[in-house]
From Swiss-Prot:
Source organism of this protein record: Leuconostoc citreum (strain KM20)
Classification via SUPFAM superfamilies: DTD-like
Pfam families: Tyr_Deacylase
Described purpose of this protein according to its UniProt entry: An aminoacyl-tRNA editing enzyme that deacylates mischarged D-aminoacyl-tRNAs. Also deacylates mischarged glycyl-tRNA(Ala), protecting cells against glycine mischarging by AlaRS. Acts via tRNA-based rather than protein-based catalysis; rejects L-amino acids rather than detecting D-amino acids in the active site. By recycling D-aminoacyl-tRNA to D-amino acids and free tRNA molecules, this enzyme counteracts the toxicity associated with the formation of D-aminoacyl-tRNA entities in vivo and helps enforce protein L-homochirality.
Protein location: Cytoplasm
Main localization category: cytoplasm
Protein name as catalogued: D-aminoacyl-tRNA deacylase
EC number: 3.1.1.96
């Protein structure tokens, strides 16, 4: 499982010009799921992301978690994170999870993130063509890969 985390001041996702999810301060999470991903991978990421201290404290140091600032999440499914670009110029997405499997794991990830963090989790729509807009904060961008824990 791969997740790209971006610290944001605000973000929203639209489908067919309709806003389906929006947040103020928090994280945008781009979530890529592989067929080998498990519930253990989900919980590893949920704990790491919820407890990650990348928000500034009163002295300007990255010392606060999203829970400390009572932020929110915008979670977006993104199979293209699993692109293989080793051969040729066209990416291969054979490493991405089967859509039925991936949709279930993505929903489980979002549910566990809500339960563990106690914070709101806005989402896009799995498999949809989405427009995501955001205002980066920092910028702070961190890549998580459960195959490299």
């Amino acid at each position: 499982m791969k997740v790209v985390l971006q610290r944001v001041k605000s973000a929203q996702v639209t489908i067919d010009n309709q806003i389906v999810g929006a947040i103020k301060q928090g994280y945008v999470l781009l979530v890529g799921i592989e067929n080998t991903d498990t519930a253990e991978d989900i919980m590893y990421l949920v704990r790491k992301i919820s407890q990650l201290r990348v928000f500034e404290d009163e002295s300007g140091r990255m010392n606060l978690s999203i829970q400390d600032i009572e932020g929110t999440f915008l979670s977006i499914s993104q199979f293209t994170l699993l692109a293989n670009t080793k051969k040729g110029n066209r990416p291969s997405f054979t490493g991405a999870g089967d859509p039925v499997f991936a949709e279930k794991l993505y929903a489980n990830f979002n549910d566990q993130l809500r339960l563990y963090s106690g914070l709101d989790v806005e989402t896009g729509q799995f498999g949809a063509d989405m427009a995501v807009s955001l205002v980066n904060d920092g910028p702070v961008t961190i890549l998580f890969d459960t195959h490299q824990k």
